[in-house]
Amino acid sequence: MYVSSLKFPFLGIGVWKGVRLWRQRSLGTSACALKQDDFIKELDQNFVRLQKKLMDSLPSSDWSPFTPTGDLPPERADVVIVGGGVMGWSIAYWLKQKENRRGALKVVVVERDPTYSRASTVLSAGGIRQQFSRPENIQMSLFSAQFLRNINEHLGVVNEDRIDIQFNPSGYLFLASEEGATIMEENYNVQRECGAQVTLMLPDQLKKKFPWINTNGVALASYGLENEGWFDPWTLLNAFRRKALSMGVYQCHGEVTDFSTAKREMITADGDPVTFSRIGHVTVQMPNSLESQSVECSLVINAAGAWSSKVAELAGIGTGPSNSLEGIKLPVEPKKRYVYVVHCPNGPGLDCPLLIDNSGAYFRREGLGGNYIAGKSPAEEEEPDISNMEVDHDFFQEKVWPLLAHRVPAFESLKVKTSWAGYYDYNTYDQNGVVGMHPLVNNLFFATGFSGHGLQHSPAVGRAVAELIVDGGFKTLNLSSFSFRRFWSQEPLLERNIV
């Protein structure tokens, strides 16, 4: 069992206070000061050797917060975070924020793509909203909005430039048909109960507020009045990363390829065997190299986003009998989504919100030069190939543009300027995040599967995971319903408002 220096502070503090006090009293009263001095020096040396021996036995022994971090992982760590996207760096920041003294926790973030060329975070449209159907998602968004508004208080670094998150508080606008109006009203009631500033509008009110909208087929609209809009995803990722590094977090560029685990088999009350395991070492493969490094650790956090299911399999999750808890996989898959930047000089102006059409198409303003970001999630039978980052331009021409032009007639004359593809860490079970410890691998935690809203919830989820680890439970927002156990108990936590 790993013995933490946090639990035994007397090893580094109490012993030394006693020695110093005894030494001061001895030197002040004894007539044999020289002999006592020699004895004290020898005793000091023995204590130094003892302290070094104790510290060498801990995973944090070879690290100093003042030592510059490099790309190679250390031999030991307290916490290894798999995934250096915004979720991983948020968790790292909050862990260091909660440590009781600098250097108490040695945290390592492992990211296989240091350029972030395939990262979900920086390829996102950058939206934040409170218009969800689950109270937990609404509460996380409310916290994240306040966090972003005060980001320099949280993530500012001395002698570094202030953070400009480029937050555009223009709101989200959801449109519903007759079939979806009842659900929209139900969601609205939940949102208001949670404190979200949202209003409902009938078609004539909608047309008065936004004259450029064609209201045909719209029965009801839901509009966010505060704390909704969009921001720059890369700035948030880099701000979390910069702050965490300044607090002593170690970053490593490489890919986690294996876990070494200790296993123990037990028999349940029903007489069924069950295997519990604990990760002892993480194997990190260096980029463009055959070299790998084994990292001894106490905890592992799976924040690998779209690829987190593969990381879970390395720990044996989902590899047992299909009718057992050991056989339940982490139901998170990569889903490729296209984002198109279009230009339309006569399109909606400064009042343009992030509009979610009842057809599933969406768009928002990008700057003030007549540019917009647009897209749509494909139907299940049209899911694109995830093996590459190529963009399907026919999908825009056939599936997106007609819907945009129907809702905003000015978009009939738009032109595509550029486009890109990104990945959702899509939870196929209920489209909600997975947060907390695995029930059988008792030092593996999850923070993944948010199905497109992980970026906006990263400040809240990072804080929640840090609370679980440092405090032993959720202290601010109760996210226990997001646990892995719901897959075994067959209790889906459905989110209706997935874009």
UniProtKB/Swiss-Prot annotation:
One Pfam assignment: DAO
Uppermost EC category: oxidoreductase
Membrane topology classification: Single-pass membrane protein
InterPro entries the UniProt entry points to: FAD-dep_OxRdtase, FAD/NAD-bd_sf
Enzyme Commission code: 1.-.-.-
Keyword Electron transport: yes
Obligatory cofactor(s): FAD
Any one GO MF annotation of this record: oxidoreductase activity
Keyword Protease applies: no
Keywords: Electron transport, FAD, Flavoprotein, Membrane, Mitochondrion, Mitochondrion inner membrane, Oxidoreductase, Respiratory chain, Transmembrane, Transmembrane helix, Transport
Transmembrane regions: 75-95
One BP term from GO: mitochondrial respiratory chain complex I assembly
Domain of life: Eukaryota
Recorded GO CC terms: cytoplasm; mitochondrial inner membrane
Subcellular localization: Mitochondrion inner membrane
Cysteines paired by S-S bonds: none
Function, in words: Required for the assembly of the mitochondrial membrane respiratory chain NADH dehydrogenase (Complex I). Involved in mid-late stages of complex I assembly.
PANTHER family from the UniProt entry: FAD-DEPENDENT OXIDOREDUCTASE DOMAIN-CONTAINING PROTEIN 1, SARCOSINE DEHYDROGENASE-RELATED
Protein name in UniProt: FAD-dependent oxidoreductase domain-containing protein 1
Lineage, opening ranks: Eukaryota, Metazoa, Chordata, Craniata, Vertebrata
This protein's encoding gene: foxred1
